[in-house]
Every structure is written in C-alpha cells, then in structure tokens.
Amino acid sequence: MQQPWKAVALSDLPLREDLKLQHAYGAPQLDVPVCLNVNENPYPPSPALVERIATAVADAARAANRYPDRDFAALRSHLAAYLTHDTGVTVDASSVWAANGSNEVIQQILQAFGGPGRSALAFTPAYPMYDEYCRTTFTRLHTLPRTEDFALDLNQALDSIRAHQPGVVLLTSPNNPTGTALPIDDIRAILDAAPGVVVVDEAYAEFRRHGVPSAVTLLPAYPRLIVTRTLSKAFKFAGGRVGYCACAPAIVEALKLVRLPYHLSAFTQAAACAALVARDEMLSQVEAIKAERDSTVDWLRGLGLTVADSDANFVMFGEFADRHRIWSGLLRRGVLIRESGPPPYLRVSIGTGAEMAAFRAALLDVMALE
C-alpha cells in the first residue's frame, strides 16, 4: 500500500493559483552521443586545471563548519579583473555582483526593481526565463517582437518605453535564441529613454565577432545600466553555476537587499576563483568555437536554409514546415539540438569538430527524407 505522503498529487496541494497551469522550465537532458542543445562549451577543463580546482575546493572544505564570505570579496575581485581585461573598461570589485548563475542575478534584479505594480519590457524571441523571472516576482512583462531579421525596431522600442514606463528593460546581446547582437548605439538610445534600469544580458559575449563592443563600455556614463554575464558558456564552467553582473555600486547595494544569506557557497567561490585565475586556459577554445560557428552558418545557408547571424556559440536555422519532425529525426540519429525560437526554426549549439560533423551528416539524412 502506497504511503499517503507519496500518493499526494501536485493538484492536491494548496498551490498558488498562478502556478497551477505552469510547467517547470528545462531543456531535455538525454543521454545521447552528441548533445548540442544547451549552449555549453564542449571542451572540458584540462586534467591539470581539474586538479587545481579540486585543490581549491579541498582548501575551502577545511573551513566547511563556517559560513562563507557572504560578499565573496575574492571572487568579485577576480571577476572585476577579468572584465577589465576583456572590455578595456576599468571595473573594480565594488561594481561587481554574483550569484548561482546569471539566472539568479537577473531574478534578483527583478526582485529589486520589478515587483507588484511594476513592469518589465523584453523583445521577442527572447530568453524564455524572462517570463519566469517576471511571473515569480509579480512583475508585469510587456513584449515587443523583433523585426524579420531579429533586430530591434528602435523607434518601436522607444515608443514602447514611453508607453509602458518599465522599471526594467531586458536586452539580450547576443540574443538567445537568435544569436544576434545589438548595435551599441541602439543600447545607448534605450538607456537614454528608459526610466528604470536597463539590463544587457551578455551571457554569450565572449563569442561576439571582432569589432562588436560590450555594453560594459557604456557603464561609466550610465548609472542605471546592468550588464550580466556568466561563467557557464565560454568559461566552460556550467557545472559551477556562477553568473555575475557589472553595474554601479549603488545597484550592488540594492541587490544585497534581496539576496538570500550566504547564497554563494564557499566551494562555489573557491572553484570559480581557481577557474578565473586560469582564464586563458578556460577560454582557449573560444576562437575555435567561433570558427566552427561561422563555417556552420555558411554550410546551413548553402543548403538553402535561413540562418540568423550569430555572435554566440549557437546558430538558429530554418525554416521548417515541421521542425519537430526534423528535431526528432536528429534525435533518433543520436544528435540532440533544441526546438527554440519561432516555430519554423531550430537551434544548434556549436560542439567539437567531430560533433558538428555528426550533426551535419544527421541533418542531411533527415532532410533527404522530406
């Protein structure tokens, strides 16, 4: 006989009304030979770096009976040094904040600057978690569709800002799922118009093409700008779950008001610091990934497919009358990609050369059956 506590269904619980028809967000996690669906760096850390990270975590374990540094000063210093190196803008530790993935950073931003009676503005197709952040913080989300080539219609964006007066504007550059980057002048114009904070989500910034600037370059002139980044993508540290942002020190103080106590464990801090010390090694395959991306774009276009320009480590391509059939056909051949973006499109993460060869062979096989 099943015990009562195990027999209770979700529908039996006194769940909040707004959650009753919701589904938990998450990409498929399947055991397949070629996994190209969640935009990870396909190259693992070297054995030597694994050992250094393990040593750092072991050192932290010696004080595991104590709470970690709640303001993670060492990690913020390492992140500030990296941003300064990457962008050429001097960033100090007081202008950096971090959490368990940039998901948590953006959620904290919505907790601090959104909430009941306030709104946010995003541009679709956009990262689907923005919906989740707004729902869980009771922030009303306004959306504006991108143009046919997935750019922003700047005039419409400015009109929407004037109409809705959002507390938070969410910009994604490079955008997920399209891969397209925003012109820096468009970001500047939105900053000039926005009454609240402007978030530029740069999770994929390290993959941007040469000559595409980071929004971090705008920070000195715009105290309400927040640029979010992550170690999960280019830094091949997805398992470490560390995201961060650069912003005015006053915004850091605002985020401290909503963070949970000791939200970054001592082990997370130690591992991330070790990874950042080895930043050259962690980022050593970025140029190879960019080259593979560009060749993938050319190859897909050679098949007559529509492919969005990409400054990320993934490519969105279509247009398919039945994208699920293509996705399923690839999966049957051991290749997992993502049904993401507008319905005619699919998204493929850039993997190793061997993984991309498998993807190309599988796609040709599936398309031959159409």
Curated annotation (Swiss-Prot):
Q: Which UniProt keywords apply?
A: Amino-acid biosynthesis, Aminotransferase, Histidine biosynthesis, Pyridoxal phosphate, Transferase
The catalytic activity, as recorded, is:
L-histidinol phosphate + 2-oxoglutarate = 3-(imidazol-4-yl)-2-oxopropyl phosphate + L-glutamate
Cystine links in this protein are none
Which enzyme class? transferase
Provide the E.C. number(s) assigned to this enzyme.
2.6.1.9
**Database matches in CDD domains:** AAT_like
GO BP terms: L-histidine biosynthetic process
Pathway recorded for this protein: Amino-acid biosynthesis; L-histidine biosynthesis; L-histidine from 5-phospho-alpha-D-ribose 1-diphosphate: step 7/9
One Gene Ontology term of the molecular function aspect: pyridoxal phosphate binding
Which residues are annotated as modified residue N6-(pyridoxal phosphate)lysine in the UniProt record?
Answer: K233
Q: Which cofactor does it need?
A: pyridoxal 5'-phosphate
Query: Subunit comment for this entry?
Result: Homodimer.
Family classification: Belongs to the class-II pyridoxal-phosphate-dependent aminotransferase family. Histidinol-phosphate aminotransferase subfamily.
What is the protein name given in its UniProt record?
Histidinol-phosphate aminotransferase 3
List the top taxonomic levels of the source: Bacteria, Pseudomonadati, Pseudomonadota, Betaproteobacteria, Burkholderiales
